[in-house]
Regions:
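N-terminal secretory signal peptides that target proteins for export/translocation
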Residues: 1-10
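Short hydrophobic transmembrane-like helices used for membrane targeting/insertion
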Residues: 3, 15, 24-26
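Sec-dependent N-terminal signal peptides
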Residues: 10-22
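C-terminal segment of classical bacterial N-terminal signal peptides
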Residues: 21-31
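N-terminal intrinsically disordered, cationic/polar leader segments
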Residues: 35-63, 67-70, 74-83, 87-91, ...
Length: 190
């Protein structure tokens, strides 16, 4: 005796079978693609020189890799000018000497503190323009060898041991930075 199945039950089984076949077909196509796609080969790592490229193009902007002795602000400025970046958002990590600033509203200037040999756990900021020159604005969090963390506005950053990696996401519109007369500080205009 054969058990009669409900039509919805048969339809569900059919849909499962079709879904499984499609998934197997997609997986097979991906595997075939992976087997035929050439893999990137990289040259052996060498010590950087002045001629060593500091950035490469990505689908959304650029990836920078700075090395010992590089100044993050100088390299970002060079990139913005060379690639005619209208504006951008930046994120990064790295190791080096950082000068943090804390805005003193009474002085309308930064109180600065230099930290040497720290690990930048996070860097975030923007690239805009002021007086036809790139204006880089970065904040970050740094940790030292005792695992103490410090953070704030980054006034300067020089890479020491290791490297600094910065992702630059380019925006289509040129943004300008200017002095806000109410607070006396640079502010991004949108």
């Amino acid at each position: 005796m054969q058990v009669q199945r409900h039509p919805k039950q048969r339809l569900c089984k059919l849909m499962l079978a079709v879904s499984a076949a499609v998934m197997i077909d997609i997986a097979g196509a991906q595997l075939a693609f992976a087997e035929t796609t050439p893999t990137a080969t990289t040259a052996p790592m060498q010590c950087p020189t002045e001629a060593t490229p500091r950035y490469t193009k990505t689908p959304t902007g650029y990836l920078m890799v700075l090395r010992t002795g590089d100044n993050a602000f100088k390299e970002l400025t060079k990139l913005a000018i060379a690639e005619k970046i209208p504006s951008a958002s930046i994120t990064g990590i790295g190791f080096g000497n950082v000068k943090f600033g804390f805005w003193n509203k009474d002085k309308k200037d930064f109180d600065a503190k230099l930290l040497n040999g720290v690990e930048m756990a996070s860097i975030t900021g923007s690239v805009a323009w002021k007086n036809d020159q790139p204006s880089i604005h970065m904040h970050g969090v740094a940790g030292d060898a005792t695992f103490q963390a410090y953070g704030g506005h980054i006034l300067d950053f020089e890479v020491t041991t290791g490297s600094m990696e910065i992702t630059v996401i380019v925006h289509q519109r040129r943004l300008e930075r200017g002095i806000d007369p109410c607070i006396g500080a640079n502010v991004l205009g949108i």
